[in-house]
């Protein structure tokens, strides 16, 4: 890849760590508390209607996450045509959330942190937020990650309030959901599962007590 293409890509893939609430102080070493969020029918905001999110707590009772069932239909190489390694990425880019839509984030399957500013979501699964780290993932292990434009962030205690208002079902985090090849039916599938949980159906999953009441 030529020098111009690489520099343009790194400008577009912003070093956003300092802009992401709760991510500037440290990377999370203990992934306990990561959850799958399933939008309930009460949630009518177009950004979140029918959405499934992977969310993780960070510092100061904040949470961040990405929407995992919204493929954009655009390839990474179509967004960055001068960035040759992007052509190796097979899956489409996903819409991760309404915040920082100009930035690319990655959820990567790897047995160690991929680089500075990355947050461990669960065992061998990390959210990469810095542009240089995302760039490195694309160049070295392009198909061990899923790439997102934008992300979701909650202020301290905000997600707890949304759950209490009945906007989200909360299920255990599942890394397999992130890499589903066809997520078109994922929301309906998890909605049925979540309703079975709340109804006390035999064989139900446990709802995760993931949020502080503070």
Residue ranges and their predicted role:
Residues 4-6, 21-24:
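Intrinsic disorder/low-complexity segments
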Residues 1-12:
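Bacterial N-terminal signal peptides that target proteins for export
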Residues 25-214:
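A short aromatic-anchored loop/beta-hairpin motif
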């Amino acid at each position: 890849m030529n020098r111009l293409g690489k520099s343009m890509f790194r400008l577009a893939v912003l070093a956003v760590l300092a802009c992401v609430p709760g991510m500037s102080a440290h990377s999370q070493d203990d992934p306990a508390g990561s959850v799958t969020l399933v939008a309930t029918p009460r949630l009518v905001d177009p950004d979140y209607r029918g959405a499934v999110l992977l969310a993780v707590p960070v510092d100061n009772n904040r949470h961040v996450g990405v929407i995992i069932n919204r493929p954009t239909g655009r390839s990474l190489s179509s967004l960055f045509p001068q960035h040759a390694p992007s052509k190796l990425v097979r899956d489409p880019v996903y819409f991760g959330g309404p915040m920082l839509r100009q930035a690319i984030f990655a959820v990567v399957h790897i047995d160690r942190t991929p680089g500075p500013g990355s947050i461990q979501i669960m065992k061998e699964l990390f959210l990469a937020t810095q542009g240089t780290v995302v760039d490195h993932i694309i160049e070295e292990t392009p198909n061990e990650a899923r790439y997102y434009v934008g992300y979701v962030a909650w202020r301290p205690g905000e997600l707890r309030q949304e759950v209490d208002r009945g906007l989200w079902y909360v299920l255990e985090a599942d890394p397999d959901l992130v890499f589903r090849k066809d997520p078109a039916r994922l929301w309906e599938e998890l909605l049925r599962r979540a309703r079975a949980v709340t109804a006390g159906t035999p064989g139900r999953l446990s709802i995760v007590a993931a949020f502080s009441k503070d």
